[in-house]
């Protein structure tokens, strides 16, 4: 029997989405623009990184060919290897949102065919009746924010007032999301999670995809920083996913990082929490050791998106990609005959783009393992082909969406 390891490099888009203009994202290309900045010396940072973007392991697995097929060009300054060792291609999202749940659910074989609810950009973001009900049920004196904002910016701006007043900081973005920032000590982590749980229930009727708890510490705007205790409160996927189908067949799904939250803890056998890409890779390697025949290890590497993409930090994103690439040999060493590794992404978040939100892009699809024959799979229509390929590899019945490339 076989095993599968699915790694989502959160927001690592490769450009070229045919519908990008409808989202205001025409020309967005996370990989391509990072490579351009690196090649031009604009992503050098003392003590962190310098020079052209260097991803030798992913390049040997077909990343350069993926970039060209998705966006029409090779990334600047990056050598194209003579030989490729993996299955490689790109995928075009068919779900309407460019958000985390839509991308992950579609990867797991369940595209999102409906429109999420969103909050208005102008004026107060949240309905007054919702805020009144939430404050009443949570017994808080009110909220701060009530707007679209960058998380780090709004914590710096309102964090001190939050500590003085006890009012949680509530904000949103272009995603279908209600985010709540609160101090872990002054407000309390348990109280923050309870507040978000109440919000989740009240927002179901508004069709909001996620409520996110964003705890932070520090005593002033200059010292505030988020902690690793983030939690996402998601709605359930609209139909059974690959994860549910595996559980039904008696398999185990090892959810590393925020995967459990993204799937509302449905179709999950084991949750392994870790904070930061390095710790997430360590946890993934441990999960690979624990995985039995027929199991899936599913990891989200969130730093690319949360720390570097949204904050438009090109050197940081480049360094994180290089660090991830350098860890891939650790994965290779763990592989047994019958194992399959898949590397992909859920959307883009071009750190050179205007604003702070996700960008509509195609995503890379890399698959490799012992005995896997290298070949191009072209540009796939829909991420669900990834989930269906894993289903076929693990020997479970096909689902209603997608087509295996194996």
UniProtKB/Swiss-Prot annotation:
This is Phosphopentomutase. It comes from the Bacteria. It comes from Rhizobium johnstonii (strain DSM 114642 / LMG 32736 / 3841) (Rhizobium leguminosarum bv. viciae). GO terms for cellular component: cytosol. Its EC number is 5.4.2.7. Its main location: cytoplasm. Binds 2 manganese ions. Mn(2+) 2 binds at residues 305, 310, 358. Keywords: Cytoplasm, Isomerase, Manganese, Metal-binding. It is found in: Cytoplasm. Its cofactor is Mn(2+). It catalyses: 2-deoxy-alpha-D-ribose 1-phosphate = 2-deoxy-D-ribose 5-phosphate; alpha-D-ribose 1-phosphate = D-ribose 5-phosphate. Isomerase that catalyzes the conversion of deoxy-ribose 1-phosphate (dRib-1-P) and ribose 1-phosphate (Rib-1-P) to deoxy-ribose 5-phosphate (dRib-5-P) and ribose 5-phosphate (Rib-5-P), respectively. GO terms for molecular function: magnesium ion binding; manganese ion binding; phosphopentomutase activity. The gene is deoB. One of its GO terms (biological process) is metabolic compound salvage. It is an enzyme of class 5 (isomerase). PANTHER family: PHOSPHOPENTOMUTASE. CDD domains: PPM. Pathway: Carbohydrate degradation; 2-deoxy-D-ribose 1-phosphate degradation; D-glyceraldehyde 3-phosphate and acetaldehyde from 2-deoxy-alpha-D-ribose 1-phosphate: step 1/2. InterPro entries: Alkaline_phosphatase_core_sf (IPR017850), DeoB (IPR010045), Metalloenzyme (IPR006124), Phosphopentomutase_DeoB_cap_sf (IPR024052). Belongs to the phosphopentomutase family. Mn(2+) 1 binds at residues 10, 346-347.
């Amino acid at each position: 029997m076989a095993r599968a390891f699915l790694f989502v490099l959160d927001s690592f888009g490769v450009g070229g989405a045919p519908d990008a203009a409808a989202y205001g994202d025409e020309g967005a290309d996370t990989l391509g623009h990072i490579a351009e900045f690196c090649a031009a010396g604009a992503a050098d940072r003392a003590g962190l990184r310098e020079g052209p973007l260097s991803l030798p392991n992913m390049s040997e697995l077909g990343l350069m060919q993926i970039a060209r097929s998705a966006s029409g060009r090779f990334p600047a300054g990056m050598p194209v290897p003579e030989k490729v060792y993996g299955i490689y291609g790109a995928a075009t999202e068919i779900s309407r949102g460019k958000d985390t749940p839509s991308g992950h659910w579609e990867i797991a074989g369940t595209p999102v065919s409906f429109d999420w609810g969103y909050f208005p950009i102008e004026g107060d973001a949240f309905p007054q009746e919702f805020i009144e009900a939430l404050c009443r049920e949570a017994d808080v004196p009110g909220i701060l924010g009530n707007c679209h904002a960058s998380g780090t910016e709004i914590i710096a701006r309102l964090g001190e007032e939050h500590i003085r007043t006890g009012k949680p900081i509530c904000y949103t973005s272009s995603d279908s999301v209600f985010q709540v920032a609160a101090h872990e000590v002054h407000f309390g982590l348990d109280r923050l999670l309870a507040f978000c749980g109440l919000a989740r229930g009240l927002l179901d009727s508004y069709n909001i995809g996620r409520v996110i708890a964003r705890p932070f510490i520090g005593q002033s705007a200059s010292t505030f920083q988020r902690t690793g205790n983030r939690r996402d409160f998601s709605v359930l996927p609209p139909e059974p996913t690959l994860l549910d189908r595996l559980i039904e067949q008696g398999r185990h799904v090892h959810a590393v990082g925020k995967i459990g939250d993204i799937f509302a803890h449905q179709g999950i056998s084991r949750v392994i929490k870790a904070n930061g890409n390095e710790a997430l890779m360590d946890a993934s390697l441990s999960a690979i050791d624990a995985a039995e025949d027929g199991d899936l290890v599913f990891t989200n590497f969130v730093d690319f998106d949360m720390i570097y993409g949204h904050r438009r930090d090109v050197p940081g994103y480049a360094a994180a990609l290089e660090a991830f690439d350098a860890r891939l040999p650790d994965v290779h060493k763990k592989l047994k005959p019958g194992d399959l590794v898949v590397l992909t992404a859920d959307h883009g978040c071009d750190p050179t783009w205007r604003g702070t939100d996700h960008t509509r892009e195609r995503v890379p699809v890399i698959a490799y393992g012992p005995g896997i024959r290298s070949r191009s799979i072209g540009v796939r229509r829909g991420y669900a082909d990834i989930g269906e390929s894993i289903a076929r590899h693990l020997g479970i019945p096909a689902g209603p969406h997608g087509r295996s490339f194996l």
